[in-house]
Structures are given as C-alpha cells and as structure tokens.
C-alpha cells in the first residue's frame, strides 16, 4: 500500500481505487443481468415454456428492459410507513451485498481488498444483510412484511451457524483465512480441490468435505431465502413477505441485493470446495502472457459460479417449499450437529494427525 501511494500519490491512488471498484461493480451488475435471464429461462424450460424471448435476440435484453421499467415507475410510500427507514432498508441491503464482494478474488491479484481475514470479513458483512430486511419489514407498517422480516431473521441466523462451522472445517485444512491462499492451496488439478482431495491425514479429506459441500450449498439456499426455503416471501402465505409494500426502484434494490448474495454464495462454494479459479486439468499457465493467463483463471471461476447458479435455479424449479417447522428442524437438529462433528473431527486430525 505504501509503494502504491508513493507511486501514484494519495489522490491518484484514491482515484485508481475508485475506478477499480466502479469497474468491478459494472461487470458484476452486467453479469447479474444475464444470470437473472438464465434463472428465468431455466424455470421456463422446466415448465415447458419459452421464457423471455421478445426483448433482443433470444430475450437477452429482458433484464435491461426490466431495469428501466422499475426505475421509471413512481415510488409509492405506504401511508403510516416510516418513510426514512422504508427507503433506507433496500439501500442497506444493496450496499452490504456489494461490499461483501470486496474480498472475493476472481483471479490471482484480481481482488479489491486481499485481506488476511477475508473469510471473517465476508462472514461479518453477509451476517449484517438481515438488518435491511428487518428494517424494511418493520418500516412498511403492515403485518405481512413484518411477519416476513421475522421469518427471515430467524432463518438467516439459524443457518449462519451451520455455514460458520463448515467454513471453520475448511480453515482448519487451509491454515489461512485469506481467500486467495485457500484457492492456491487447491491448485494442480481437480484431485487437489477440497471436495475431492485425499491429503495426508488419517482419513481421506473428501469423506468430510463432500458432506460439508452439500450442507453448505443447502444452507446457502436458506441463507439467501431461495426456494425451497423462501418462507420470508412465501406468495401463498405472505403475498410477497417483506417486499409487499415496495415498488419501483426500492423493490429493484432489494432484488439486486438478493441476487448479489446468491451469486456470492455460488462464488464461495467454488472457492471453499471446488478450487476457485483453478482449472480441473492442473494446466500450468505461469508462462502465458499476463492477460491470457488471468483470462484463463477468470473463465474457470466464472464457469463454476454459473454452474452453481444453475443448480440454484434448478432447485427453485423442482423442489417444493418446506414448512417452517421443517426448515428449523433441518437447520438445528441435522445440519448443526453434523457440521459441529466435522469441526471436531477435522480439528483432531489436524492436531493429532501425521502433519499435526
């Protein structure tokens, strides 16, 4: 950082940092537009429909048309609502969803803030996301949004515990909380990815990591309020939950924040278990030109994110919604004991194993 400031000056360094953040945000939002289209196309295909196919070739511009539709609608604040909190809630959700991405590396060196405690920062920021939903549900001054907000708070807190323990198992193996180092540890081919790796300890690593990857993926569905765990916005019970009273741009901000969190969970699944930017073949690209090698890394990272987003979309289309008691039972009585046992097992292996 000191060298960076000495080279460009304080204001020059600040300007470059702002440009990097803006470029990253623009790429992320454009990618999100096409992922939204994919989500709708997958759902339509499962239901034997065509899906969006009018705006642009094959409906490719549908998300951009929806963006302008939301932006140019009137913002209607319900009578009796707390106006300032009502408008602040979607902003909180969106900002927290964006800043969480600051520590996610898309390729070696392609990260806004390469923190040594990146996992801790990410977990802290994602945990704060529930505040936007709670504030929005309470400020709307309506029973359906309030019930949806209460459900969301209980659901996100319940599954954050399991996600936290699963992340601890990965940290014990990696010996680092830096996301780039966790990815680099998995280089050299798919047989070194955490989910498939043997590694030198008393039992094959994949025997623990495969169940942890499955539980992490299911917990990510609950953490992001996606089907079959979309109880906070259940249409058949709460109309649309905490979003009932929102329209126009505030509703758009909620939706973008929600999908940014979904893509983040896809990225975390790829980073923690499936090698991040590492390709499955173990190809050595260190001798390639800088742009070519980093484009190769970025391609594989993006491909893994798209694959897991596709899995999110398929679950949404195929799996019926859980009841609230089933949701809580799954989180507290099944996932929590399994993830806690995995932490104890991996901790014992790290301390008392051949490498301990």
Curated annotation (Swiss-Prot):
GO cellular component: plasma membrane
Cellular compartments annotated: Cell inner membrane
Keywords, comma-separated and alphabetical: Cell inner membrane, Cell membrane, Membrane, NAD, Quinone, Translocase, Transmembrane, Transmembrane helix, Ubiquinone
Classification via Pfam families: NADHdh
Enzyme Commission number(s) of this protein: 7.1.1.-
Catalysis performed (reactions): a quinone + NADH + 5 H(+)(in) = a quinol + NAD(+) + 4 H(+)(out)
InterPro entries: NADH_UbQ_OxRdtase_su1/FPO, NADH_UbQ_OxRdtase_su1_CS
Translocase in keyword set: yes
Superkingdom of origin organism: Bacteria
Topology relative to the membrane: Multi-pass membrane protein
Regions crossing the membrane: 16-36, 52-72, 85-105, 117-137, 163-183, 201-221, 254-274, 295-315, 334-354
Molecular function (Gene Ontology), one example: NADH dehydrogenase activity
Any single biological process term in GO: aerobic respiration
Described purpose of this protein according to its UniProt entry: NDH-1 shuttles electrons from NADH, via FMN and iron-sulfur (Fe-S) centers, to quinones in the respiratory chain. The immediate electron acceptor for the enzyme in this species is believed to be ubiquinone. Couples the redox reaction to proton translocation (for every two electrons transferred, four hydrogen ions are translocated across the cytoplasmic membrane), and thus conserves the redox energy in a proton gradient. This subunit may bind ubiquinone.
UniProt family annotation: Belongs to the complex I subunit 1 family.
Assembly mode: NDH-1 is composed of 14 different subunits. Subunits NuoA, H, J, K, L, M, N constitute the membrane sector of the complex.
Annotated protein name in UniProt: NADH-quinone oxidoreductase subunit H
Organism, as annotated: Maricaulis maris (strain MCS10)
């Amino acid at each position: 950082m000191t060298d960076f400031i000495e080279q460009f000056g304080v204001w020059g360094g600040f300007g470059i940092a702002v440009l990097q953040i803006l470029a990253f945000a623009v790429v992320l939002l454009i990618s999100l537009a096409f992922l939204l289209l994919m989500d709708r196309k997958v759902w339509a295909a499962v239901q034997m429909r065509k899906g969006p196919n009018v705006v642009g070739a094959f409906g490719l511009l549908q998300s951009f048309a929806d963006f302008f539709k939301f932006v140019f609608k009137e913002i209607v604040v319900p009578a009796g609502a707390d106006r300032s909190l009502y408008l602040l809630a979607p902003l909180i959700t969106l900002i927290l969803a964006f800043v969480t991405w600051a520590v996610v590396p898309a390729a070696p060196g392609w990260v806004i803030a390469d923190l040594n405690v990146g996992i801790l920062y990410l977990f802290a920021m994602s945990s704060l996301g529930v505040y936007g939903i709670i504030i929005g549900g309470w400020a709307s001054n309506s029973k359906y949004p309030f019930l949806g907000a209460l459900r969301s708070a209980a659901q996100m807190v319940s599954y954050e515990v399991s996600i936290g323990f699963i992340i601890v198992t990965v940290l014990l193996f990696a010996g680092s909380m830096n996301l780039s180092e966790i990815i680099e540890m998995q280089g050299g081919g798919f047989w070194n990815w955490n989910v498939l790796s043997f590694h030198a300890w008393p039992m094959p690593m994949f025997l623990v990591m495969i169940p942890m990857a499955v539980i992490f993926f299911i917990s990510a569905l609950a953490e992001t309020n996606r089907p079959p765990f979309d109880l906070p916005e259940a249409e058949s019970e709460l109309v649309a939950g905490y979003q009932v009273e929102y329209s126009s741009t505030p509703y758009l901000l909620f939706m973008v924040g929600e999908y940014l969190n979904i893509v983040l969970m896809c990225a975390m699944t790829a980073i923690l278990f499936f090698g991040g930017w590492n390709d499955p073949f173990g190809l050595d690209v260190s001798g390639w030109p800088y742009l070519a090698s980093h484009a190769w890394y970025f391609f594989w990272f993006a491909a893994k994110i798209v694959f897991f987003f596709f899995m999110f979309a398929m679950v949404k289309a195929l799996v019926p919604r859980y009841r609230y008691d089933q949701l809580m039972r799954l989180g507290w009585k099944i996932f929590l004991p399994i993830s806690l046992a995995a932490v104890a097992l991996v901790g014992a292996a790290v301390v008392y194993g051949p490498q301990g």
